[in-house]
Structure formats: C-alpha cells, structure tokens
Amino acid sequence: MGQKINPLGFRLGTTQSHRSFWFAQPKNYSKGLQEDEKIRDCIKNYVQKHMRISSGFEGIARIDIKKRIDLIQVIIHIGFANMLIEGRARGIEELQTNVQKSFHSVNRRLNIAIARVPRPYGQPNILAEYIALQLKNRVSFRKAMKKAIELAEQADAKGIQVQIAGRLNGNEIARVEWIREGRVPLQTIRVKIDHCSYPVRTIYGVLGIKIWIFLDEE
C-alpha cells in the first residue's frame, strides 16, 4: 500500500512555513502545543457562535501563533469581511478577552491581529468548510465537489483534488470518492501545495473531507 505523507510537513522550510513559531525546553514543549490548540479552538468556537456571515460559515483560512517571553501574537487569516474586520475593534477586543480567560496566563499579553486572504476559495480550509455546509444541507456530494472545484478554478488554482470518505448520500457501506482537476504534483517539493483534512458531522455519521490545492511553482 502507498504510504501518504502530509504534503504540508513534507514541504516545511521550502514552500511552507510553520503555523506556530516559538521555542521551548523539551519538558515544556507539550504544554506549549496544548496551549496553541486551546487558542485555536477558542477562536473557532467564538467565531462560530458570534460572527456568522451571510454564506453561513466563518471562513478562517488559518491561525498563526508567534510566542515571546511576554507576548503571544495570534494572526487570524480570514477569507471574508465579517465582524472581525476593520472598523469592528470591539469584536477583536471581545475575542481577545475571551481567549485570555481560557488559558490563565498572567505574565504574557495576548495580541490578536486580522489578515485578509486575497482569494478565499484558493484556501483548502475555506473550500472544505463550504463542502461541509453543502453536505449538511443534504446536497449531493458530487455536486458539492464539482462546485468547490469551480470556485478553486476561479481563484486561479493550477490544480485541485477533493476527496470525501464515509457514508456518502446515506449509503449503508462507507466508501471513498475523489475528483481531480488540473495538476496536483504531490511528489515535487518545490511546488506550493496546500492541504487540509476536515471532518463533518451529518445525519448519516461523520464524513472526512480532504483537499489538495496546487497553488504555484517556486
């Protein structure tokens, strides 16, 4: 059987950079990792509760975390203008307070910044979220996949592969379906490939969505 390496980890240091940037002693490493997960979960939960946009999903592309001794800098990359964007400083302050409460750090300040992603549908997380929303609304999985590919092509992606696994359309037997458009050269390290794995809960059970997008060649 073919062993599939994660395309993001495979390209770290060439076309991909770390989503968390900090240094720690080996004994404190796990604590720092858990803290990062807590921050990301807290932000996603807050956005889901308070800041739904018209299309029905929050549209977070990724969350980068940089840590210093006295400061935690969090950069939220979002695809669509919502309450967190310019002119809504109160929303950011409220989110900052909410996250600060969740991990009780007295010595370090938390600073949250927002960055806008120019082509949202070129981001696999946003595309996966779009497909998840369609599947929850009982749209056919093939239709959802084709629409996601159209959106990625409009965002100038050179290639895209979408895979959905689980009880598709409510079938008794789980299976894996995938569709590819354009080139997705997973073995070439110099090409910039973005990837995400996204679980979605439907009335038939949990489905797994995986997306690979070929963005650019270095």
From Swiss-Prot:
Pfam families listed in its UniProt record: Ribosomal_S3_C (PF00189)
Domain (KH type-2) ranges: 47-118
Location relative to the cell: Plastid, Chloroplast
PROSITE patterns membership: KH_TYPE_2, RIBOSOMAL_S3
GO molecular function annotations of the record: rRNA binding; structural constituent of ribosome
Any one Gene Ontology BP term: translation
Keywords: Chloroplast, Plastid, Ribonucleoprotein, Ribosomal protein, RNA-binding, rRNA-binding
A cellular component term, taken from the record's GO annotations: cytosolic small ribosomal subunit
Source domain of life: Eukaryota
Subunit structure comment from the entry: Part of the 30S ribosomal subunit.
Family: Belongs to the universal ribosomal protein uS3 family.
PANTHER family according to UniProt: 30S/40S RIBOSOMAL PROTEIN S3, SMALL RIBOSOMAL SUBUNIT PROTEIN US3C
Name of this chain's protein: Small ribosomal subunit protein uS3c
Organism from which the protein derives: Nuphar advena
Gene designation: rps3
